[in-house]
Amino acid sequence: MAATDSPAGDGAAGLRRLLLSGLVIPAHPLALDAARRLDERRQRALTRYYLAAGAGGLAVGVHTTQFAIRDPAVGLFRPVLELAAEEVRRAGRRVALIGGICGPTRQAAAEAALLRDLGYDAGLLSLAGHSGDDDDLLAHCRGLAEIVPVVGFYLQPAVGGRDLSHAFWRAFMEIPNVVAVKVAPFDRYRTLDVVRALALSGRDDVALYTGNDDSIVADLAGLFEVEGRRLRFAGGLLGHWAVDTRAAVALLDRCRPGGMDERLAIDAVAVTDMNAAYFDAAHRFKGCIAGLHEVLRRQGLLAGIWCLDEAEGLSPGQAAQIDRVRRARPDLCDDDFVAASRDAWLSG
C-alpha cells in the first residue's frame, strides 16, 4: 500500500485536525494462542472491537503489543501492523493509525519507513534505551520525522523510559513534523515540562495526549495556563484503553467541557484504582500486559493471557484486584457491550 493510501486518509493536515479534535486511542494488544503464535482471528476481533467502541485511533506495535514482536525469531511486527491497517480500511471511517518506533537510529528508521509504506499516519517514538545527550536524541528525532510524522513519547523510567529535560522538549517542539506528544512520565512536574514546552513554542498544531495512567481524568479535565496560553490534553493514548474502550469514549466526552465536578472527581479515583489493578502497580507493573489480557479473556475476546515471554503473567493477588475494581464500577466496564457483538467480531 502506498504512503498516500493511509487508512486514515487526507494527509498531514487532516491528521493534525483529527488529533486535535480529541481521540480515544487504545494501545493494541497482541492475541496469541496457547502455543504463543499469532491468533489472527482474535487479533482482528480486537481491532473490530476498538473501532465499534468509537476509538478515534489505534496504536500498534507499542509496549502493549509487546516489543518482542520485533525479534526476528518472532517475526510479528509487520503482520500485526498489516492486520490493523486492513481492519481500519474495512471500517471505512477516519481513524488515526499510529505505529510504534523504537531502537537505535538504524532500526527506528527502518520501522518508520515500514509504517510509511503500510500507510500509517504517524510513528510513536520511544526513546527508551537511548543513552545520548539531548543533542543526540534530537538528531535522532529529526531524522525520523523526515520519514513519517512523529508522536513524541515521554515514557516513565519505571518501565524503561528516561528523564527528559524541559529544554529537550522545547527543542523537540520545533521539529516541523511533530504532530502530537504522548505524555506519560507518571510525574506531575515532568508533565508540566512538556506542557510548558508546547506553550512556549507558540505552536497550535501539536496535540497533547495523556499516557499518565495514574492521572488519566485529571489530565483530560485539566486546564493549563502558561504565560497567557491555555492548553488542554486533547485525548489519551493508553494501554488502559485497550479494555473498556466504549466506556473510555464516554469518559472523554464528559471531560471535554473542562472542569472537575464532584462526579468526575469520584470517577477519576475509580479509573486510577482500576488502572492499578490492570497494570499491577503493586508489583511495579510486572503484570501490566497480562492484566489487560485477563480482562479481555474474561470477556471472550482473547482465549488466554499468554505473552511472548513465558515468564509474563498475573502477579499474586492481581486477579482478585481485577475482580474487585470491576465489581465496584461496572458502569466503567464494557462487559455487556462486548457480549452483544463479540461473536460477530470473531467471525467477521
Predicted feature locations:
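General structural feature for long, well-ordered alpha-helical segments within catalytic domains
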Residues: 39-42, 46, 76, 80, ...
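C-terminal alpha-helical cap/extension of soluble enzyme domains
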Residues: 3-15, 25-29, 53-54, 230-348
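Active-site beta->alpha loop and helix N-cap motifs at the rims of alpha/beta catalytic domains
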Residues: 2-169, 336-337
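Repeat-unit-sized solenoid/scaffold elements
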Residues: 122-142, 187, 191-194, 221-223, ...
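Catalytic alpha/beta core domains of metabolic enzymes, predominantly
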Residues: 156-288
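Alpha-helical structural signal in soluble globular domains
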Residues: 79, 83-91, 114-118, 143-147, ...
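Hydrophobic, Leu/Ile/Phe/Ala-enriched alpha-helical segments that form helix-helix packing faces
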Residues: 50, 84-88, 198-199, 275, ...
